[in-house]
């Protein structure tokens, strides 16, 4: 149990990448926690936004791999925000503080929904250059909990955790997926009542994405085809919303493929970011491009051979 937490990779990550805490709101209790790794000269990095149960370090495998290839990667943990507008305003202030004009966003589940809402919120003065949406959704009504969204703040921590755990896989899973679930349960335990209540509120508050505002943004939709908290209908809705999106399909990986299928996820991220190489919106150090592209080509070949 808890293999990931004691793994050499995770310990190396914790000992080499510092966790930063930043306040951008008037309210000092609203603290953004983040890992910022890779070359600082990159002005359009890839930013990871976690699911309800996640902390910034759930993306440690992406940070280690992608920074090794020369990418600048930032993984975030949200402050306590109670509505989407407040989140978007806070995130915009954070990007201003970090002096980042435009960014690429990778959002997992709730993180993906918030990434879309932020792209929508800033559509008149765009801050999002591209989106990778992993196991994500475009309309909170799919959870059938919009009526309870206003009462999460009242619930004790154990009840909130029970709600979140209800979406974790309960059937048989392979050892890597079991390790990923253990790690996410551990991360969930580290969240306080207000953190959890606010995230569940954002996840279930009645809201949907307005696609016409973000239709010009390049999108990759990353989906897993085994057990995940998302229904087939929710996935189909995403495909309809983004008809021109690239699709990255993983046969297995459950709710947390970035932990248990990290090599595949990392490769799909690299394939997505490849289209921006050589532009001012590249997330990679120009001196690293040729070696990285060769590796991506090899990996893509492996994926297409597997699919045949």
UniProtKB/Swiss-Prot annotation:
Domain (AB hydrolase-1) ranges: 87-159
Origin species: Bos taurus (Bovine)
GN (gene name): SPG21
An MF annotation (GO) of this entry: CD4 receptor binding
Protein name in UniProt: Maspardin
Keywords recorded for this protein, A-Z: Cytoplasm, Phosphoprotein
Record's subunit section: Interacts with CD4.
UniProt modified residues of type Phosphoserine: 304
Subcellular location(s) per record: Cytoplasm
Record family assignment: Belongs to the AB hydrolase superfamily.
Cellular component GO terms held in the UniProt record: cytosol; trans-Golgi network transport vesicle
PANTHER family per the UniProt record, alphabetical: ACID CLUSTER PROTEIN 33, MASPARDIN
InterPro entries in the record: AB_hydrolase_1, AB_hydrolase_fold, Maspardin
Entry function: May play a role as a negative regulatory factor in CD4-dependent T-cell activation.
Database matches in Pfam families: Abhydrolase_1
């Amino acid at each position: 149990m808890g293999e990931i937490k004691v793994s050499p990779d995770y310990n190396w990550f914790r000992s080499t990448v510092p966790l930063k805490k930043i306040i951008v709101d008037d309210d000092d209790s609203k603290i953004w926690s983040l890992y910022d790794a890779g070359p600082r000269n990159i002005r359009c990095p890839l930013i990871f936004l976690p699911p309800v149960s996640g902390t910034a370090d759930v993306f440690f495998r992406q940070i280690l791999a992608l920074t090794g290839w020369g990418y600048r990667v930032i993984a975030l943990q949200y402050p306590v925000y109670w509505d989407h507008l407040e989140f978007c305003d806070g995130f915009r202030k954070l990007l201003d503080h970090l002096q980042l004009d435009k960014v690429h966003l990778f959002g997992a589940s709730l993180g993906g929904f918030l990434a879309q809402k932020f792209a929508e919120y800033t559509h008149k003065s765009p801050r999002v250059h591209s989106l990778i949406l992993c196991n994500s959704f475009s309309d909170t009504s799919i959870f059938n909990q919009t009526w309870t969204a206003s009462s999460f703040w009242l619930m004790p921590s154990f009840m909130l955790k029970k709600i979140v755990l209800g979406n974790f896989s309960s059937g048989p899973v392979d050892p890597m997926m079991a390790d990923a679930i253990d790690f996410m349960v551990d991360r969930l335990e580290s969240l306080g009542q207000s953190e959890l209540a606010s995230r569940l509120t954002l996840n279930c508050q009645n809201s949907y994405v307005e696609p016409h505002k973000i239709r010009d943004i390049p999108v990759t939709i990353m989906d897993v085809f085994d057990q995940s908290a998302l229904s087939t209908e929710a996935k189909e809705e995403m495909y309809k919303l983004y008809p021109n999106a690239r699709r990255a399909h993983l046969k297995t990986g459950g709710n947390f493929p970035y932990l248990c299928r990290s090599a595949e996820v990392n490769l799909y991220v690299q394939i997505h970011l490849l289209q921006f190489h050589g532009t001012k919106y590249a997330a990679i150090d120009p001196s690293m491009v040729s070696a990285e592209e060769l590796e991506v080509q090899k990996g893509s070949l492996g994926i297409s051979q597997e699919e045949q």
